[in-house]
């Protein structure tokens, strides 16, 4: 309703609910900002949350704690809404913190699984690193600007020291890197697939992982005056989207492949932010939510149909006749992810890749070809998922296939998302026409739209389709299992987990042990009750009695 109001009156709706704190000249307001950016994000948040709740009613129907699950999922939707519609960074940080905490509860919902508990711990610890950088940014906002609301900061940004803006941009980028699973703080996203599939469909496709991108877009007035950081954002997105595609092409867990595709698409959004195309980034977020949630739901339908609930695609095969609607849903979502013309992904994804070339800079050219490589890999692993799951020869026993079936109540929300995955892309001009975020010197939309040669626009599509056909041919006629060192390198996720554990985690634990021994317990031994009692034992009792005598009789 609010989006329709905004489009009718062409002005944002601000609702002031009062002030939280008034300390000197620092005023922290409490209010809602229902502008075009917030409303564009609220549409997928609301629709996908509703579909996931309907889907979870059947998916979790046999779980004894299902009512708790529904409550936690609903509370998550509330705090995600607070994050999106807040009019200042403090209120946004509250939503940011709570969606992180609730994601821990949802990932570890099946608490009897050790892998799920470890995954939840990894998620909250890595996100806590991002929260730390966000808090540092809040401290700079309060100490330097004496304000945290978006309107005041956007007016002050053009007149602010460039060093301050660069530091703020870096802190917000690091916070977004953790929340949106960019390279360096991405390990938690794959491990989070241990949670229930409805959690993956909501948190790790449409809402929570997009929060980092949303914060960067909302902070456009800071990023626009920090051009050196924009280049860094571009390269972070380019490397992440390429690495995630290379890992996905050799991953066998169906949910982890989809999670890696989420990581890749988030990197495409980060690339758009790096070239100041904030409208394209938020529009891709808007479109991506629908077909990625559909992809997770389709995968959940496949997993739920197996007795063992296995996620290994090598144990699937021949399911096109057993799960026809799940096949249709995954097919449409995969084609949209591959940016096939006529589907939602084509209208939001390819224009970002074209815009990289449209910057006409050396970095833009390199990042364009990196993004084309990522788009090609996206087509390859999408076709690989379809082939191994539905077209390949059956790889499970007869009893498994006798019990495979689809549930009609799980299909209803998927039908809604199928419609959105096909038609929502036609609404592009109506959505992005309401943004005016980037500085004129940084805007490359006109060059992208009117000056690029045709082969630059069609290169991702041509490479993706041709190599996908080659992949199908290899699987049908020339497939041999010959793991190489390159295969093992990417199959082990570029050994990032081992590097993180051995270089950072172990050293941090040792350092924390020293701090606990010498600082925490050490202070207690010196200044606490133990230290006082030990000091008293060393005082001569005669001196103590003399002091008491002097105190009482000679005062």
From Swiss-Prot:
Enzyme Commission code: 7.1.1.2
GO BP: any one term: ATP synthesis coupled electron transport
Transmembrane domains' residue ranges: 37-57, 69-89, 90-110, 133-153, 155-175, 197-217, 230-250, 257-275, 287-307, 323-343, 366-388, 406-426, 454-474, 494-516, 534-554
Subcellular compartments: Mitochondrion inner membrane
Membrane protein topology class: Multi-pass membrane protein
Catalytic activity as recorded in UniProt: a ubiquinone + NADH + 5 H(+)(in) = a ubiquinol + NAD(+) + 4 H(+)(out)
Main localisation: mitochondrion
Coiled coil ranges: none
Keyword vocabulary terms for this entry: Electron transport, Membrane, Mitochondrion, Mitochondrion inner membrane, NAD, Respiratory chain, Translocase, Transmembrane, Transmembrane helix, Transport, Ubiquinone
Domain of life, source organism: Eukaryota
Enzyme class: translocase
Job of this protein: Core subunit of the mitochondrial membrane respiratory chain NADH dehydrogenase (Complex I) that is believed to belong to the minimal assembly required for catalysis. Complex I functions in the transfer of electrons from NADH to the respiratory chain. The immediate electron acceptor for the enzyme is believed to be ubiquinone.
Protein name: NADH-ubiquinone oxidoreductase chain 5
Gene responsible for this protein: ND5
């Amino acid at each position: 309703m609010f989006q329709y109001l905004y489009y009718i009156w062409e002005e944002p709706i601000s609702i002031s609910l009062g002030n939280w704190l008034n300390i000197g000249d620092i005023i922290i307001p409490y209010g809602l900002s229902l502008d075009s950016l917030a409303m564009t994000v609220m549409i997928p948040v609301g629709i996908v949350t509703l579909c996931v709740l309907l889907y979870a009613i059947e998916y979790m129907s046999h779980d004894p704690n299902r009512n708790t699950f529904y409550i936690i999922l609903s509370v998550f939707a509330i705090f995600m809404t607070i994050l999106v519609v807040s009019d200042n960074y403090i209120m946004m940080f509250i939503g940011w913190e709570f969606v992180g905490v609730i994601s821990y509860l949802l990932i570890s919902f099946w608490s009897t699984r050790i892998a799920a508990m470890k995954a939840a711990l990894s998620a909250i610890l890595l996100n806590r690193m991002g929260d730390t950088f966000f808090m540092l940014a809040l401290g700079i906002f309060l100490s330097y600007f004496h304000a945290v609301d978006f309107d005041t900061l956007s007016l002050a940004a053009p007149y602010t020291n460039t060093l301050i803006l660069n530091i703020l941009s870096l802190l917000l980028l690091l916070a977004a890197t953790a929340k949106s699973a960019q390279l360096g703080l991405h390990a938690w996203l794959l491990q989070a697939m241990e949670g229930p599939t409805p959690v993956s469909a909501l948190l790790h496709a449409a809402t929570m992982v997009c929060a980092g991108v949303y914060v960067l877009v909302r902070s456009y007035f800071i990023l626009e005056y920090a051009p050196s950081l924009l280049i860094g954002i571009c390269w972070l997105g380019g490397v992440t989207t390429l690495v995630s595609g290379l890992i996905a092409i050799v991953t066998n867990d169906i949910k982890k492949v989809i999670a890696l595709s989420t990581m890749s698409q988030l990197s495409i959004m980060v690339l758009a932010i790096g070239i100041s195309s904030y409208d394209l980034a938020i529009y891709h977020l808007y479109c991506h939510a629908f077909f990625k949630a559909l992809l997770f739901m389709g995968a959940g339908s496949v997993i739920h149909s197996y007795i063992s609930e296995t996620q290994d695609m090598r144990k699937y095969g021949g399911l096109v006749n057993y799960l026809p609607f799940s096949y249709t849903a995954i097919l449409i979502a995969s084609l949209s992810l591959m940016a096939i013309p006529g589907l939602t992904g084509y209208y939001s994804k390819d224009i970002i890749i074209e815009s990289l070339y449209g910057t006409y800079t050396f970095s833009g050219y390199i990042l364009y070809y990196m993004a084309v490589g990522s788009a090609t890999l996206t087509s390859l692993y999408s076709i690989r998922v379809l082939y191994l799951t539905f077209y390949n020869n059956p790889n499970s026993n007869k009893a498994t296939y006798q019990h495979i079936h689809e549930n009609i109540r799980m299909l209803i929300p998927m039908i809604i998302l199928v419609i959105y995955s096909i038609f929502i892309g036609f609404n592009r001009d109506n959505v992005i026409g309401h943004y005016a975020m980037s500085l004129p010197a940084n805007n490359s939309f006109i060059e992208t739209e009117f000056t690029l040669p045709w082969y630059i626009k069609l290169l991702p599509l041509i490479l993706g389709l041709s190599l996908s056909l080659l992949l199908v041919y290899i699987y049908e006629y020339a497939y041999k299992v010959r793991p190489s060192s390159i295969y093992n390198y990417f199959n082990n996720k570029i050994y990032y987990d081992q590097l993180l554990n051995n270089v950072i985690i172990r050293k941090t634990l040792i350092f924390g042990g020293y701090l606990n021994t010498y600082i925490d317990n050490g202070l207690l031994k010196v200044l606490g009750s133990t230290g006082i009692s030990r000091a008293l034992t060393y005082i001569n009792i005669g001196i103590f009695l003399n002091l008491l005598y002097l105190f009482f009789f000679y005062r």
